[in-house]
């Protein structure tokens, strides 16, 4: 007990003296969180192994003020260790493979030994150590955070309002089955389980169509909860306001309506709230990743769906400046970075447009954050660079193109990926033409080589530069 209290006290002191920095790497499914964390660790661990030319925009590395970086044991021994070595092995195979997507929570901690450059503490101690804590977790689980503010009826009505376009078409079969049950009847466990499975199948179909706003997120990535009654419920999207009120008055405790309500509340209070309290209340800085290219290949609704999902997430993070007292007792996010991933899937002249799309994606959330007066930045990166930009001469003209291994057929290709719109086109655009941004395979990582990237050094400078 005393050892536990001592550990917590030491962590409070370290946080207050800026010795510990906890970074939330946030993003929806397939946005590149695992690749981002793997690359960030790799770039840091390779500092001083070469001339640091891989990080020209990271001042502390370029000025050789970082003395050493090593991975150290994390504080919470109940959380699995981030599989950095496994991810490197995947990239080192022949042929190389992308690291596996996140299927559960994991954590890593880096100790960064550095030479102080300025600030009050440089007079007290020339050298310092910054402990960097980074968490990885499934993007699907993030989608459940908005449920913290919604009861069963509110949640169902929210999804009812969004039931249009592709969502409505894919949900039709499941909706027909739900409409056939009498919600005041005594609940049959087998029927509930089957309807919950049908709802889960609908969510999977949404994912395949490039849609991101799917709830509950754990239905498509349940982890240890697979098959548990806690995941055997579903929203009621066919009820009117008067029907809701009638069911609340008349439905008995063993009815379908009551059981669905209880299971939703259990899920919200025990699973979602526990996840939020354990991982999201003590972050200092936040990175929000978004793949803005892949949704463009599908439809305007796919992009708008991703936009809505991210806006919902902003409600559940604490933003504000970090002064000494709130660093100790009320940690808040004081820096926020919006990152468009897969910047290596387009040519460099299209990067401003990609960043412009990212700005449009988070505009509403950005306005909210600006009110809290914290530092924000927008950029585009490739955590693990899969292509090389080349210049192609054709018919007497030169233009930029990409060279890499295309994922669809595993062939080495040289192609022009096309233009990125600076703003999201109208819905009419997709009726006449469409975007076709290819996916690429990673290049093989040689032993001892740092992971090739685009602008990870700019990310490190923004997140860590003022602490080193």
Where are these regions (language model features)?
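Conserved glycine(s) of the Walker
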Residues: 31-33
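Switch- and interface-adjacent substructures of P-loop NTPase systems
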Residues: 4-13, 17, 43-332, 347, ...
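Hydrophobic anchor at the beta1->P-loop junction of P-loop NTPases
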Residues: 23-25
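Short secondary-structure boundary/capping segments
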Residues: 40-45, 147-152, 303, 352-358, ...
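GTPase G-domain guanine-specificity segment
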Residues: 345-370
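P-loop (Walker A) phosphate-binding loop of NTP-binding proteins
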Residues: 28
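Post-Walker A alpha-helix
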Residues: 36-37
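Short, conserved secondary-structure transition motifs
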Residues: 339-346, 379-390
């Amino acid at each position: 007990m005393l050892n536990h209290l001592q550990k917590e006290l030491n962590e409070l002191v370290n946080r207050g003296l800026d010795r510990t920095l906890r970074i939330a790497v946030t993003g929806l499914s397939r946005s590149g969180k695992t690749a981002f964390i793997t690359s960030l660790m790799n770039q840091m661990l390779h500092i001083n192994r070469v001339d640091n030319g891989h990080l020209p925009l990271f001042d502390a590395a370029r000025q050789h003020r970082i003395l050493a970086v090593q991975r150290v044991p994390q504080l919470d021994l109940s959380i699995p260790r981030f599989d950095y070595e496994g991810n490197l092995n995947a990239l080192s195979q022949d042929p190389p493979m992308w690291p596996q997507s996140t299927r559960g929570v994991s954590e890593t901690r880096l100790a960064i030994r550095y030479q102080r450059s300025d600030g009050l503490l440089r007079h007290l101690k020339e050298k310092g150590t910054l402990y960097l804590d980074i968490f990885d977790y499934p993007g699907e689980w993030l989608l459940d955070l908005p449920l913290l503010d919604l009861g069963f009826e509110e949640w169902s009505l929210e999804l009812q309002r969004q039931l249009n376009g592709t969502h409505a078409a894919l949900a039709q079969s499941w909706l027909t089955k739900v409409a056939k049950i009498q919600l005041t009847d005594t609940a049959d466990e087998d029927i509930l389980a089957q309807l919950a499975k049908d709802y889960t199948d609908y969510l999977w179909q949404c994912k395949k169509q490039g849609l991101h706003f799917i709830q509950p997120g754990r239905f498509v990535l349940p982890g240890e909860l697979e098959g548990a009654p806690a995941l055997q419920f579903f929203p009621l999207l066919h009820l009117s306001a008067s029907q809701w009120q009638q069911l609340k008055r008349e439905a008995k405790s063993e009815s379908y309506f009551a059981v669905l309500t209880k299971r939703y509340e259990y899920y919200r209070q025990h699973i979602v709230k526990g996840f939020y309290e354990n991982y999201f209340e003590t972050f200092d800085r936040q990175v929000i990743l978004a793949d803005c290219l892949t949704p463009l290949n599908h439809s305007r609704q796919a992009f708008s769906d991703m936009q809505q999902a991210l806006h919902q997430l902003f409600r559940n993070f604490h933003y504000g400046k970090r002064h000494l007292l709130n660093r100790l007792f009320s940690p808040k996010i004081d820096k926020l970075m919006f990152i468009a991933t897969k910047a290596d899937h387009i040519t460099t002249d299209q990067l401003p447009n990609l960043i412009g799309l990212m700005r449009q994606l988070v505009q509403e959330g950005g306005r909210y954050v600006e009110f809290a007066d914290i530092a924000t930045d927008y950029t585009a990166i490739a955590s693990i660079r899969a292509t090389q930009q080349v210049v192609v001469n054709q018919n007497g003209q030169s233009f930029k193109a990409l060279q890499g291994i295309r994922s669809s057929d595993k062939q080495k290709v040289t192609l022009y990926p096309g233009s990125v719109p600076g703003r999201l086109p109208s819905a009419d655009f997709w009726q006449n033409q469409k975007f076709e941004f290819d996916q690429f395979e990673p290049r093989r990582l040689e032993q001892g080589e740092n992971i090739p990237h685009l602008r990870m050094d700019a990310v490190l400078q923004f997140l860590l530069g003022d602490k080193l």
